Amino acid sequence: MARHLVAAMYLVDDDPVGALAHGRAAKNRAGRIGVVRETLGVLAYRASEWAEALGELRAARRISGGPGLLAMMADCERGLERPQRAIELARGDESQQVTGDDLVELRIVEAGARVDMGQLDGALVTLQDAGLDSSARGEEAARLDYAYAEVLLASERTREAAEWFGHAVAADLGDSTDARSRLAALED
């Protein structure tokens, strides 16, 4: 089982489908271990196998407990074209236990679900309520600024979108987003 997990982690970036096969093999050998189910859920998520990912992430939560994995589960609902369920998950009782970067990620997913449903103003408010701050720095701040810029762009508020892509560039100390190229495209 452990060898399959190691192989999966080795392959996940370059071959998510191959990594998923190793994750499934690990589950076949140790399906009652929470970390195995969580890993398989993440691998299925990375391979865009939304239904499998959602099932495995739910199983991992049943085994291990706690509010973790909600953002990924909500994003799976989006992948399954069920944005209303994603919002319900993001706003449900369990979400009250989510804090910090996990809460920011959950709100980004919720905002995306609202965009999927055409609720652009609701998406903007969701991101504002997540702690949007143009002076914040770090990966989560960059992701939040970037998501906000995306919704502004979808709302045809191009000038404001460019401003927030600029904030994302400033916040993104490790260049984890493509905010710089998005900003350049808007400035052309």
Could you say what each language-model-derived stretch is?
Residues 12-14, 47, 80, 117, ...:
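Structural motif corresponding to the intra-repeat A-B loop/turn of tetratricopeptide repeats
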Residues 1-28, 39, 45:
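Alpha-helical segment of the N-proximal tetratricopeptide repeat
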Residues 10-11, 43, 74-76, 113, ...:
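Residue-level signature for tetratricopeptide repeat
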Residues 62-67, 95-96, 121, 125-132, ...:
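TPR/TPR-like (Sel1-like) alpha-helical repeat modules
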